[in-house]
Design a protein with these regions (language model features):
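Conserved N-terminal beta1-alpha1 strand-loop-helix module at the mouth
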Residues: 1-100, 109-110, 144-150, 154-166, ...
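Short, Lys/Arg-enriched charge-dense amphipathic segments
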Residues: 43, 97-100, 104, 124, ...
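Glycine- and other small-residue-rich loops at beta-strand/loop junctions that grip anionic moieties
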Residues: 78-81, 103-104, 126-127, 149-152, ...
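Non-membrane alpha-helical structural segments and their capping/turn regions in soluble enzymes
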Residues: 83-86, 131, 135
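Short acidic, glycine/proline-enriched helix-loop-strand junctions
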Residues: 98, 136-151, 183-189
């Protein structure tokens, strides 16, 4: 039941954003974007933060890490997120040298384009959420120059490697509870 509410909030947020700035205009804004995605060669260590923790913990404490994963998924549990929530990615891009990976409930090309415009270097797509749309989303993200990771339950990653996915984030049972208790922790990706 909660998943239905989360998806409804996601769709409301997406409709609001697309109403304010069309897909075409968002695409045209790339010509003014100072932040091209950087190549993610190999990730040694990552810090996992929520948007609120970017200011509160990451930037104030001047944390040094190879990669920052900003997880926006929790925002949809509360309601439809603000159209300005992704601006934290641009703030992070301006003030930290770490690579930025955007984790969200990606369901459309608009969201991937928006992530690029805001300054992320890569995205984490949810295999379970996208199902048969995963291939198209991976291909579009690659065309934009974003590095692609996939969140999955499956122990075999062969099908993801064939799509050009850089790495996986394994879903671990009860990981949501751990994130809520302490969402500022080291996380290692499995590169494939």
């Amino acid at each position: 039941m909660q998943e239905i509410g989360i998806l409804e909030n996601l769709q409301k947020s997406l409709a609001l954003k697309e109403g304010m700035l069309s897909y075409e205009m968002l695409g045209k804004s790339l010509s003014y974007n100072p932040y091209l995605p950087r190549v993610i060669p190999q990730i040694k260590d990552c810090v996992f933060v929520t948007p609120d923790e970017v200011l509160g913990k990451f930037l104030e404490e001047n944390t040094r890490t190879d990669c920052v994963i900003v997880n926006f998924k929790g925002l949809y549990e509360i309601g439809a997120p603000s159209v300005f929530d992704l601006e934290v990615l641009g703030l992070l891009r301006r003030h930290a040298s770490s690579l930025i990976v955007h984790q969200d409930l990606f369901i459309s090309h608009y969201q991937l384009l928006e992530s690029l415009v805001q300054g992320s270097d890569g995205v984490i797509l949810d295999e379970e959420l996208l199902k048969e749309d995963l291939k198209g989303m991976v291909e579009f993200a690659w065309r934009l120059g974003l590095s692609v990771f996939v969140e999955t339950h499956k122990p075999d990653y062969t099908h993801l490697k064939d799509l050009g996915v850089l790495g996986v984030l394994e879903k671990v049972p009860h990981s949501q509870q751990n994130q809520k208790k302490n969402s500022f922790f080291k996380l290692n990706f499995k590169l494939i």
